[in-house]
A protein has these predicted regions:
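Bulky hydrophobic segments
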Residues: 1-119, 123-148
């Protein structure tokens, strides 16, 4: 139990939350070789014409797993500071906005394939992270709470 209290301090959760934003952004925009794209580009059409059935299972799982720490750490920070339920919705919506923004930016990266379904799978990862945090708070309240 002491190990969990050290690992899951408020400072660690803030660090995990910020680190998850960095990792998501880095992973989504690497190799950072941006190029101009006209509004008539097929890349914009590709972004808008995708469906949830697009993508292979590895990509889907990667998109989900990539955002679980964002949802988990964000939910833990909320539960420590203001457990009002509306803040969990704000967290989920802000994570989805980040995911959408990254997909739009990928239009300008020729080596990346922008797809709206990626953002939807990211949303699933955020939600899973929030659910895990809420489950742990409810069933194991002493594990994630600390005196920091």
């Amino acid at each position: 139990r002491m190990i969990f209290n050290v690992i899951f301090t408020g400072k660690c959760m803030k660090g995990l939350f910020l680190f998850s934003i960095f990792v998501v952004t880095y992973a989504s925009l690497f190799p950072f070789e941006f190029q101009y794209v006209s509004l008539e580009s097929d890349r914009i059409n590709d972004l808008l014409s995708t469906s949830l059935t697009g993508g292979v299972i590895g990509d889907v799982l990667g998109n989900i797993i990539l955002f679980i720490p964002f949802g988990f750490a964000g939910a833990e920070l909320i539960s420590r500071n203001n457990p009002d339920k509306k803040y969990y919705i704000y967290l989920i919506l802000s994570g989805f906005a980040l995911a959408l923004a990254l997909q739009v930016i990928q239009i300008y990266l020729p080596s990346r394939v922008p797809a709206l379904y990626d953002a939807v799978w990211n949303l699933a990862g955020i939600t899973i992270g929030v659910v895990i945090a809420l489950f742990m708070d409810h069933h194991f309240p002493n594990v994630l709470k600390s005196d920091d």
